[in-house]
Amino acid sequence: VTAANQEKMIAEVNKLRDSDSRLLQSKNYEVFFTEASKIPNVLHEIGRLREVTFREVGEGTNESIDLDKYDQYYHHMFLWDDETNQIAGAYRMGLGSEIFPKYGIEGFYLNDLFRFESELHDMMKNSIEMGRAFIIKEYQQKPMPLFLLWKGIIHTTLRYPEHKYLLGGVSISNQFSNFSKS
């Protein structure tokens, strides 16, 4: 799959700058948090880069792009490099207070992996589900990208204080030994 149209991505990022979607800025980096509907081209590129990055470590969906139904209604936090006009990394983040009323427990990606007892439903309403995180290869050895994404998580929790919990699944690459994975 070809990369998303860069001019359209830049236009979407510029619109986000004019709204309340920028969480933070540090030198040439900006971290944004927004809905999928506001970033169709950026989201396409997130899906493409997610697949490329996961394949590089023996993971991935084996599809041309890694997007699923959850990407359409989850929020996306992404790290934008102003110097290169590209996405350096991203997280998918679902706000439980929005997901649960619309979709119930079935609306959470984690429900595909685990069975949630009804006693946990209130917790899920007050949770931010995180996942599908990546940093593209060119930025993985740089000190700031991971730090800024984590700082973006902090800013998100401050912006949405009704969410008391962060949760999500973690994939551990098969490149690690069984001992390391245990």
Regions found by a protein language model. Give the residues of each.
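Conserved N-terminal entry element of GNAT/NAT acetyltransferase domains
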Residues: 1-37
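A short amphipathic beta-strand at an alpha->beta junction
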Residues: 71-72, 165
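Short beta->alpha transition motifs characteristic of CBS
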Residues: 91-97
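Acyl-donor binding region in acyl/amide transferases
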Residues: 61, 98-182
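Short amphipathic alpha-helix that is part of the acyltransferase structural core
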Residues: 23-66, 72, 76, 80-89
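Intrinsically disordered, low-complexity boundary segments flanking structured domains
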Residues: 13-21, 64-66, 114-120
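Short, glycine/acidic-rich beta->alpha junctions
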Residues: 69-71, 148-149
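Generic detection of long, well-ordered alpha-helical segments
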Residues: 2-6, 36-47, 143, 147
